[in-house]
Regions:
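Acidic, proline/serine/threonine- and glycine-rich low-complexity intrinsically disordered segments
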Residues: 129-131
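A positional/architectural concept
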Residues: 2-42
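Short, structured motif recognition centered on aromatic/hydrophobic residues
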Residues: 16-20, 92-96, 100, 121
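Active-site rim/adjacent substrate-binding subdomains
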Residues: 26-29, 33-63, 70-77
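Short, solvent-exposed interaction modules
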Residues: 57, 63-94, 100
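A short beta-strand-loop micro-motif that forms or neighbors metal/cofactor-
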Residues: 7, 30-45, 102-127
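Conserved small/polar residues in nucleotide/adenosyl-binding loops
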Residues: 133-140
């Protein structure tokens, strides 16, 4: 299974398009999607991105909670209702929906952050601050 690896920063053009890193596009296309699925992170100031097979895993996990459980309804509405399937143009660019851009505080650049089976999209300044905080926490744990 191919994974989303590394971090890239790409600029949003005047038409609102951003180029998805080619290595990320390759992983998404290997999973049968000429685009990506995105939704607001439920816990971070970022956008979660993934392939269709990851959404199927999420769906399976939610369904295991039972068809009428409150947990299922809450999680389904917070993930599936706010998800967008976004297709690549000929140059591998996408237009990220405005509500997702706003939820992540993205302005004119996007940090694409590989997370293994998924990836995140951040405002680069926000990601840098979060990344620095995580680095400091790891240093504290080592010593």
């Amino acid at each position: 299974m191919a994974l989303f690896l590394s971090t890239y920063i790409n600029r949003i053009d005047k038409k609102g398009r951003v180029s998805v890193p080619s290595s990320f596009r390759s992983v998404l296309e290997q999973n049968g999607l000429k685009g990506m699925i995105c939704y607001p992170s439920p816990t971070l100031e970022s956008i979660e991105g993934c392939a269709i097979n990851r959404m199927q895993k999420i769906s399976d996990a939610i369904e295991s909670a039972g068809p009428f459980s409150e947990e299922r309804n809450t999680f389904s509405s917070s993930i599936f209702a706010d998800s967008h399937q976004i297709h690549f143009d000929q140059e591998g660019r996408v237009i990220i929906p405005g509500e997702l851009i706003v939820s992540a505080g993205i302005i004119d650049q996007v940090s694409f952050v590989g997370m293994g089976e998924t990836f995140q999209m951040w405002n680069p300044t926000t990601y840098e601050a979060v990344s620095y905080t995580h680095l400091r926490a790891h240093e504290t744990l080592r010593y």
